[in-house]
Amino acid sequence: MQGQPETMQDEPHYDFAPVDIYQFLEERIEAAMAAGIVKSHIAIDPGFGFGKTVAHNLQILNWLSLFHGLGVPILFGASRKSTIAKLSKGEPADQRLAGSLALAMAAYRQGAQILRVHDVAETVQALAVEHALLHAG
């Protein structure tokens, strides 16, 4: 996230969001470890939706597997985010289940180990189907 929560959506700029965020998170992991935090206790969140444009968010998702290079679990949270509404018909947050599931499954395919979701049962069902699809002969 660039800036503060009040200003994070005001013209965010990245040269290439996935690489810029990777470098930032790499520095933060190093700082955490220097402060005594064991690497196995760290997970990262590339911040989908926080101080990002729709284009930035799509870049992050399409390049999510890059973050495996950090050597820590990836948390991905796009459930009900405004990006879904901007890509579709402008639905309110409580009507973004389909988009939330689509983004979660894309993150799962890229190897995200942790998904932050609102609709747990629906996501579990979608993950079961996605897992079967990925592992079918």
Predicted regions located by residue number:
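Short acidic capping loops at alpha-helix termini that bridge into adjacent secondary structure
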Residues: 39-41
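Active-site-adjacent loop and "lid" segments of alpha/beta metabolic enzymes
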Residues: 1-31, 35, 51-137
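Short strand-loop junctions, especially beta-strand C-caps/beta-turns
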Residues: 47-49
